[in-house]
């Protein structure tokens, strides 16, 4: 299974870069089949999806999540429709000017310093799809990606992965190497990453700190851009196809759609 995942990761990267889903499809089919077989052995007699949920977050089940998502959908979808129909969308074109990658790396460093991430225990790398991994609390590695025409994509990735990073860095030394290392559940881990990404780094208070730093790093690109314009652009809400690029309001729709597909 580990070999399959390694091979599939390479093919996924190739398929993503060339927009060639058929290249990755057979590997995805094999992964799904392997997961079904694995869950059947680990949880005999248990529904396959319930078994997978148990692996990712102990205690979750379809019986619990179906009414939860139905409630979220009933309340969230009308709000999204109202926002889209209001005709008062923020202009985020200012984020899609050419922002040199080297400057964006400086912005990443600014965000990491703002979050208080210990650089002696954490490094940042560049990948196709951002993630965070840890070997122990003294060796945590976060990653990001850079798009020259989308400066905040990287910044929010660093804020998100920085949340994961802070969770790992603040584990107790006594938990290193034990079954309790790595976080209580993936659900709790994700709550920390999205807390820093959305509640903190989209706030007016953070934008007030970010704005002068962006003017310092990108003086040409930030000409004519006010702090209010940056704040509104950072909080623009619009349905999109990419989960990791989704705004705070529409992001849950991606989770609900995936949930229905996976079931």
Briefly describe each language-model feature range.
Residues 203-263:
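Long, amphipathic alpha-helical stalk/connector segments used for oligomerization, subunit docking
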Residues 14, 71, 101, 161-162, ...:
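A structural signal for the main folded, soluble domain(s) of proteins
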Residues 132-141, 165-172, 227-236:
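Active-site-adjacent bridging/hinge elements
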Residues 27-30, 100, 134, 138, ...:
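Secondary-structure capping and boundary motifs in well-ordered enzyme cores
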Residues 4-151:
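Contiguous, non-catalytic segments that form substrate-binding/exosite surfaces or channel walls
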Residues 119-121, 174-178, 201-212:
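Acidic/polar loop patches that form or flank catalytic/metal-binding clefts of enzymes
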Residues 88-94, 140-148, 172-180, 241-246, ...:
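Glycine- and acidic
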Residues 43, 146, 153-173, 190-197, ...:
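Active-site recognition of the HExxH zinc-binding catalytic motif
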């Amino acid at each position: 299974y580990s070999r399959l995942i390694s091979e599939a990761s390479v093919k996924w990267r190739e398929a993503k870069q060339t927009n060639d889903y058929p290249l990755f499809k057979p590997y995805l089919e094999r992964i799904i089949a392997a997961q079904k077989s694995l869950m059947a052995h680990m949880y005999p007699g248990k529904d396959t999806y319930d078994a997978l949920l148990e692996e990712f977050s102990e205690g979750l089940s379809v019986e619990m999540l179906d009414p939860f998502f139905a409630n979220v959908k009933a309340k969230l979808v009308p709000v999204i429709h109202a926002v889209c129909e209001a005709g008062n969308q923020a202009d985020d074109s200012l984020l899609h000017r050419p922002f040199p990658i080297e400057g964006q790396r400086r912005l990443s460093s600014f965000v990491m310093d703002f979050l208080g991430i210990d650089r002696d225990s954490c490094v940042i790398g560049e990948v196709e799809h951002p993630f965070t991994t840890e070997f122990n609390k003294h060796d945590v590695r976060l990653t990001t990606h850079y798009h020259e025409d989308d400066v905040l994509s990287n910044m929010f990735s660093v804020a998100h992965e920085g949340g994961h990073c802070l969770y790992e860095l603040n584990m107790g030394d006594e938990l290193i190497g034990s079954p309790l290392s790595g976080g209580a559940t993936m659900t709790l881990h994700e709550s920390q990453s999205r807390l820093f990404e959305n509640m903190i780094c989209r706030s007016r208070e953070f934008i007030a700190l970010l704005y002068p730093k962006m003017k310092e790093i990108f003086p040409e690109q930030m000409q004519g851009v006010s702090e209010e314009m940056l704040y509104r652009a950072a909080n623009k809400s619009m349905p999109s196809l990419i989960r990791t690029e989704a705004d705070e309001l529409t992001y849950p729709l991606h989770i609900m759609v995936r949930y229905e597909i996976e079931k």
